[in-house]
Amino acid sequence: MFHFTRILAAFLLPTLCFCGYSTAPSSTVSIDNSLIGEPEVVCETASISLLFKTRNSFNGKVFVKGYVSEPSCMTVGDGKTGHRFEVRHDSCGVRRQREINGVVISATVIISFHSIFITKIDRAYRVSCFYVEGTKKVHNHVDISALTTQLLESETQLPVCRYEILNEAGGSPIKYARIGDQVYHKWTCVAELENVYCMKVHSCTVYDGQGGPPVTVIDANGCSVDGVILQNLEYTSDLTAGKLAPVFKFADKAGLYFNCQIQLTIKDVNYGCSNTQPQCPTSQYVVEPAQKTTETAEPYPYDSHESGYPTRPANYPVASSRYPIPTTQAPASYPSSPAPPPPGADIDNGYPEPQPIYIAETPENAYDGIVGFNDTEQPFTTSAAYTEDGVYSRLIKRNVVESTEQINASNKKRPVTVGDIDLPERGILVFGLEEMEDGETTNAGDHGATRALREARNSQEKTCFSTSRMYFTLILLCLLFATTVVVFIVIVQKQRQILAQTAFFKP
């Protein structure tokens, strides 16, 4: 029994020593410095400053996130404890976000205590300043003949406007989407008074949110710039507009941030909101009419006449008593048209005399071969300029009567603008083509981006669950091993006590 106890002790002693060595805490070296209190943000006219103090001298670096390589966006500590880091509004990718009463300018500043690497004691701060647009009211009064004119003012609340990106018309707002998904852009204004205001959406831009240049999708007139991205808007009411459009994205950028403006005008009593709402062309190409109309004279075909003009050759006989043929003849002249001879002149030059052409006022027109006629044209006379070796061209002057739409357009008044609102921007996160699975289909009630986000979360939850399960199993094995060691130690102690009490060891 004593021999067995010695063997067991010799076997467990290295194991206990190894466990004691492996569980000893490792020594690390950390930077002996930290921030004192919270940094202070100073909003200036053309820049944002961050003031902070450190416990010891600071020799690290302070920079704007994403712009550490630019000298104007990064500074190195000078060994002091008090520091000031300044970022200008027009540099380092500083973001501008329009609000109803002003603009928010923000940037992410990182304070690193190491000159090269980012360590766990470093801090990152989202620095933002809100600049309020100041308003000032000016009052004045006029005294006339000792009578004081009192200024009476009446104020009414302007409509409250908003811009939303929905998964469908009448749907719910979204924050995630995929390339090719259909989203609904909606602009609405809510007014206290009905049938008073009209709205026009204009000057819409989109940018990536990372300092890239904005791209115009709706111009200043409220018309679409690129029909592939966003077509002309549909105004369903006086204060509501929207359009269904496919989702797109910038190259290598996941964010899309839209910014639009809304012009509010007074509704016209006669024409409603037609003066305010944009009249955009349905096509990207505009066909303009020619400034002049020309006519070409050629030998007249007796079989058919398809020129469209109520004219005939000068020598064409008229088989009707309603249109008499003059007996005089015109002198020969080419290429210009001669004036008709005076009445009674007897001139014989071999050329047929020009005949006056009239437009019938009744359907019983003797010109049966003419295809259509224009009742707005005045009677005119053709000349004997039709020759075999020449072409005669002349201008045709028509008295065109303006249409009702043209008259109404000229009588319309310019709408009275009461405000031009810069709406807060709206952004969505777009999943790229490389993140789309092959053969994936989108259900009617399940948005593609929402499903993608849910799948990503499920995968993350599964990974976290597997990691937690592994940790739990490892802890359980350690506890089991420790329990086994304790049991062996207790058994060894009991055996020693039993052996010490036997008579074999007594003197």
From Swiss-Prot:
> What membrane topology term does the record carry?
Single-pass type I membrane protein
Using the UniProt annotation, give the residues that carry a glycan (glycosylation sites). Answer: N374, N408
- Give the signal sequence positions: 1-19
Task: List the SMART domains.
Answer: ZP
Q: Where is the ZP domain?
A: 42-280
Which InterPro entries does its entry note?
Answer: CUT_N (IPR056953), Cuticlin (IPR051962), ZP_dom (IPR001507)
User: What this chain does, per the record?
Assistant: Plays a role in alae formation and subsequent cuticle attachment in adults.
Its name, as the record gives it, is Cuticlin-4
